[in-house]
Design a protein with these regions (language model features):
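N-terminal secretory signal peptides that target proteins for export/translocation
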Residues: 1-4
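Bacterial N-terminal signal peptides
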Residues: 6-16
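Alpha-helical and His/Cys-centered functional microenvironments
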Residues: 8, 19, 94
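Boundary at the C-terminal end of the N-terminal hydrophobic targeting segment
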Residues: 18-24
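Low-complexity, glycine/serine/threonine/alanine-rich intrinsically disordered linker
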Residues: 25-51, 66-73, 78-82, 86, ...
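Residue-level detector of conserved, well-ordered beta-strand and adjacent loop positions
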Residues: 56-59, 84
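Glycine-rich, highly charged phosphate/nucleotide-binding loops
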Residues: 63
Length: 791
């Protein structure tokens, strides 16, 4: 053993293990080296290489792919219990925990290093969301990248869909970019514009249309993709349990609701609801988006389509019952007087964007006079150059403009008119990597800092998810955007612009991994109250809560614990709260017995960490570890057996009890000790985020068991339930702040953070602490940091 230890220590000092920073070396020698000496080197050194695996010469450079893969195999063998073999002395739970944590932390750091490794020029492909927002800000065209055949889905890394090294380009992407460019330009510059019309449908007075849950009514046509205004006069008849009907516009082709609103207006006081929204080409209908089967009553059957007053309705002996004996509706119903559709609408601001890039004379017949034709070509060059500068977010080089003018000439030589040839050049601009990518750096003059044009894009895509506007372009052209005072003024301007709402919707979706909400739809037998509008409302609560913290510039402490939230009528019903005074989301106060506040106890987070049938404490613990503390736990061992239902001949047991029985094995307990305490605190919430005091258990004997949501942190602090847990989290605000800044930087810089970023993150946190970690102050300190201007 001494000989092996001497060899290993010698290699540590030399090439095989590699030179590392002092902190890593200390952690290695304290946590990993003793484990390897005791349990590994007898079979995996210079004298034996069982399984053709040698550990003593395995490089500790996790930044290389080959080394990282070998270390991943080591972690896999330890986690799976394969190593050390059962015939050898077995490590303790604590020893396994230390070595797996060291390998996992080094693997994460190595992954981040590989992802962040860049050459003299870095290319960051726009996400689908950014592509669509840029199209709108450039040309005033609403392009839906989620439409069938539009753009490919973006891969995610830990929830983020804008990480440069992950957003690769395939032939499929290229093909779809060309199709998208053609679609966008057809909408921006149609050969024959479609006139705007108003079409109204009215019920024959005094009758009104009655729309039942999950039922469609009427017909609305969008002849071309565009902006439309839908107006409906209607009223609501809530169910006897208080559930409100929801008016939505149903897309017949895509089978989805495009826009909608809860309706509160009483039967005798109808209201006019207006939606102004982009619609793809096709047919639409009004729908009452309340579910067709509720616990309020039985499923909806055949019913009348018109009625004057619901109280006057008397069904035939074979008719369908709509009212209880006391006159209250069984179902949430809509009463519609009329509806109308106006469009397509072209806003003046959108038209102005397009006109600046397209010479109007291109719509006329080509002039016979060569001099007039030359002038038209010169005008086309100027317009095209402006378009390239805006689309590529930098001034184009003369040779780049020349290249596209040659394309125009080639198109004309092939028989196309000047208008078509010019549109072909515009399509080339939109399919260029200069448009589809954010390009930083120079192959000719390598540099560590982004230039002013790149800085303008970095700032605008951070806060607006889109291209810089004219003022930001102007500052970049003057070359003074790097000046701290100029950058801060522009930062404040962008922050206060309505387009910053894109940031407050996009960042929390990625940070909190809200894309996972609804991935495992709840079992309708167990959760009959769950519906798609509740699912969307869950996400909207989280993004709306985030925006409220942003808008009021309160402390990020509110993300952990608050005495308020935002909710609409659907969530109020879900949470057992009074309905807000009007439709939509509103800030509402919370009291202790609500057991809400902050993001951790929002239904979105609680449901995304469940599996559709029951809550998953381990998943919830992993989520808290990643989203709140910025630490991804080691992967679970392979072939982990799922928790079995309680046998019919045994007492009902909570999932907590089953997990504790499962974690008696050392390879399981090592990780569960750190994860479980972060997830079991939320056992009072079921799979869709409802509060409960007993856990409903299928099978088994006896009553459903009482929920116990107490526990302790790894440092020994104890809590009794989610409210105390969140209170303890606020005591770790410094730690959360650094994790939050890391998430923010990952989003803004489009890459994983490395150990080199840690001092900058700590400095930003320290500066922000002086203002109690107020949100806008924190973002301002991040933008002012050297890291924001570095490549």
């Amino acid at each position: 053993m001494n000989r092996h230890a001497s060899i290993l220590i010698l290699l540590l000092a030399g090439h095989a293990i590699g030179s590392v920073q002092a902190a890593d070396r200390d952690a290695y020698e304290a946590d990993a080296l003793p484990f390897f000496k005791e349990h590994c080197l007898r079979c995996h050194d210079d004298t034996q290489q069982k399984g053709e695996f040698r550990l003593d010469t395995l490089a500790r450079d996790f930044g290389t792919q080959q080394s990282a893969e070998r270390w991943a195999e080591v972690l896999f063998r330890i986690n799976s219990g394969e190593m050390p073999p059962k015939t050898e002395p077995q490590p303790t739970t604590a020893e396994i925990g230390k070595v797996t944590e060291w390998i996992s932390s080094q693997s994460r750091e190595g992954e981040a290093t590989r992802m962040a490794r860049r050459g003299p020029v870095a290319h960051y492909r726009l996400s689908r969301e950014e592509y669509a927002q840029t199209v709108y800000d450039l040309l005033g065209v609403h392009f839906d990248p989620s439409m069938p055949g539009a753009l490919n889905d973006d891969p995610r890394w830990r929830g983020f869909d804008r990480i440069g090294s992950v957003l690769t380009l395939s032939p499929s992407h290229v093909e779809r970019y060309f199709r998208a460019a053609e679609t966008i330009l057809q909408q921006a510059y149609p050969a024959t514009p479609t006139p705007s019309t108003v079409n109204r449908q009215t019920a024959v007075a005094p009758d009104r249309w009655l729309i039942y849950p999950s039922r469609l009514h009427g017909g609305i046509q969008a002849p071309v993709p565009g902006l439309y205004r839908i107006r409906v006069q209607l009223s609501a008849l809530p169910s006897f349990k208080g559930r409100l009907p929801r008016l939505s516009l149903w897309n017949n082709s895509l089978k989805r609701a495009e826009v909608g609103q809860d309706i509160l207006a009483s039967e005798d006081q109808p209201t006019v609801v207006e939606f102004q929204t982009f619609l793809p080409q096709g047919g639409f209908q009004l729908i009452n988006e309340a579910p067709g089967k509720l616990d309020d009553g039985p499923a909806v059957g055949n019913t009348p389509t018109t009625v004057r007053r619901l109280q006057d309705y008397r069904p035939s002996p074979t008719g369908y019952k709509l009212l209880l004996e006391d006159g209250r509706p069984i179902f949430p119903l809509l009463l519609v007087d009329w509806y109308e559709c106006e469009g397509p609408i072209v806003l003046e601001a959108d038209l102005k964007k397009r006109e600046s890039f397209f010479p109007p004379e291109l719509n006329a017949d080509p002039p016979a006079d060569p001099q007039k034709l030359d002038k038209r070509l010169r005008d086309s060059r100027e317009s095209l150059s402006r378009f390239m500068a805006s689309a590529w977010r930098r001034p184009p080089a003369t040779e780049e403009v020349d290249r596209l003018m040659r394309l125009i000439e080639a198109e004309r030589a092939a028989g196309e008119n000047l208008r078509s040839a010019y549109l072909a050049a515009m399509a080339a601009v939109l399919t260029s990597h200069h448009y589809c990518y954010l390009v930083e750096g120079s192959a000719i003059q390598p540099r560590e800092q982004v230039n002013d044009w790149e800085l303008a894009s970095r700032l605008s895509y951070f806060l607006w998810n889109s291209m810089p506007d004219d003022e930001l372009f102007a500052q970049a052209s003057r070359g003074n955007l790097h000046q701290s005072d100029v950058l801060q003024r522009q930062f404040q301007r962008l922050l206060n612009d309505p387009k910053s709402r894109r940031f407050t919707e996009s960042f929390p979706r990625q940070w909190l991994q809200l894309h996972r909400v609804g991935q495992f739809p709840p079992d309708p037998e167990r959760y009959p109250d769950y519906d798609k509008w509740l699912e969307r409302s869950m996400v909207l609560e989280s993004t709306g809560f985030f925006h409220e913290v942003f808008a009021r510039n309160t402390s990020i402490r509110e993300f952990l614990r608050s005495d308020w939230t935002v909710m609409n009528a659907r969530l109020a019903m879900h949470y057992g709260k009074e309905f807000p005074p009007a439709a939509g989301f509103h800030r509402v106060p919370l009291i202790d017995t609500d057991h809400r506040g902050g993001v951790l106890t929002q239904a979105s987070v609680l449901s995304l960490t469940s599996d559709g049938t029951r809550h998953r404490p381990v998943h919830r613990g992993v989520w808290v570890s990643e989203a709140i503390f910025g630490r991804t736990p080691p992967p679970p061992p392979p072939n982990v057996e799922p928790l079995e239902p309680t046998p019919s001949n045994k007492l009902k047991a909570t999932i907590r009890d089953q997990i504790q029985a499962h974690t008696t094995h050392a390879t399981c307990a090592a990780c569960h000790q750190k994860i479980d305490s972060l997830g079991l605190a939320f056992d009072n919430y079921d799979a869709i985020g409802r509060w409960r005091t007993t856990e409903k258990v299928s099978g088994g004997l006896g009553d459903d068991p009482t929920v116990y949501a107490g526990g302790s942190f790894p440092d020994g602090r104890t809590y009794d339930g989610p409210d105390q847990f969140k209170k303890l989290l606020t005591e770790d605000l410094d730690r959360f702040a650094e994790s939050f800044i890391e998430q923010l930087a990952t989003y803004a810089l489009r890459r994983a953070m490395t150990i080199d970023d840690a001092p900058h993150i700590r400095a930003i946190a320290a500066a922000s602490k002086q203002d109690d970690y107020r949100f806008r102050t924190l973002i301002q300190n991040f933008v002012a940091s050297p890291r924001f201007r570095q490549r």
